[in-house]
C-alpha cells in the first residue's frame, strides 16, 4: 500500500496524530462523525462515541440527512440523527491510538483537543456476485480514510 500523507500541514510540538486507511465502514457515517467530533476534547468525544455504540446517544446528521428520522436529545440545533455503531468503533480505536501517541510524546492526555478530523472516501474494492443462469452482478465495497490531529491545550 502506498504511503499517504496527511491532508493538513499543521506543525508543532504539542500535536499528536492518528490515521487509518481503507477502513470498511460507511463513508457517509464517517464524514458525519468527523464533523461532530471536530473541536471537542478527546475524552468527551470518546465518552460520546461510547454512548453511540451503546445506542444511548445519536450522532446529528447535518449533510446526509435525507429520510433520516428525528432523534431526541441531539446536541446543538439539529433534528436528524442516527447511531453509526461500526464507524463509531473505528473512531474510538483511532482516538485511543492518538491518546497513546500523545502520552508517548509527553503530552497531557486529559487536555487534548481535536483540531482536525476528516474522513475521505478511499479505494473502491470491486467484486462480483454470482447469480442464476451463469450471470454475475457487480458489487462495490466502499472504504474510508480517516485522519485526526489533536493539540494539547492549557
From Swiss-Prot:
SUPFAM superfamilies, sorted: Ribosomal protein L22
A GO term for molecular function: structural constituent of ribosome
Pfam family, one: Ribosomal_L22
Entry keyword set: Ribonucleoprotein, Ribosomal protein, RNA-binding, rRNA-binding
CC annotations in GO: cytosolic large ribosomal subunit
CDD domains: Ribosomal_L22
Annotated InterPro entries: Ribosomal_uL22, Ribosomal_uL22_CS, Ribosomal_uL22_euk/arc, Ribosomal_uL22_sf
PROSITE patterns: RIBOSOMAL_L22
Function: This protein binds specifically to 23S rRNA. It makes multiple contacts with different domains of the 23S rRNA in the assembled 50S subunit and ribosome.
Self-association and partners: Part of the 50S ribosomal subunit.
Protein name: Large ribosomal subunit protein uL22
Species assigned in the record: Methanoregula boonei (strain DSM 21154 / JCM 14090 / 6A8)
Amino acid at each position: 500500500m502506498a504511503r499517504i500523507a496527511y491532508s493538513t500541514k499543521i506543525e508543532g510540538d504539542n500535536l499528536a496524530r492518528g490515521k487509518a486507511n481503507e477502513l470498511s465502514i460507511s463513508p457517509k457515517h464517517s464524514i458525519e462523525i468527523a464533523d461532530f467530533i471536530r473541536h471537542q476534547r478527546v475524552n468527551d468525544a470518546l465518552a460520546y462515541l461510547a454512548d453511540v455504540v451503546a445506542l444511548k446517544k445519536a450522532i446529528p446528521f447535518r449533510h446526509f440527512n435525507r429520510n433520516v428520522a428525528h432523534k431526541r436529545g441531539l446536541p446543538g440545533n439539529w433534528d436528524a440523527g442516527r447511531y453509526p455503531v461500526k464507524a463509531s468503533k473505528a473512531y474510538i480505536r483511532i482516538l485511543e491510538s492518538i491518546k497513546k501517541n500523545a502520552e508517548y510524546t509527553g503530552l497531557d492526555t486529559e487536555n487534548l483537543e481535536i483540531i482536525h478530523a476528516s474522513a475521505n472516501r478511499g479505494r473502491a474494492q470491486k467484486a462480483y456476485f454470482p447469480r442464476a443462469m451463469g450471470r454475475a452482478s457487480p458489487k462495490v465495497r466502499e472504504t474510508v480514510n480517516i485522519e485526526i490531529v489533536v493539540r494539547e491545550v492549557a
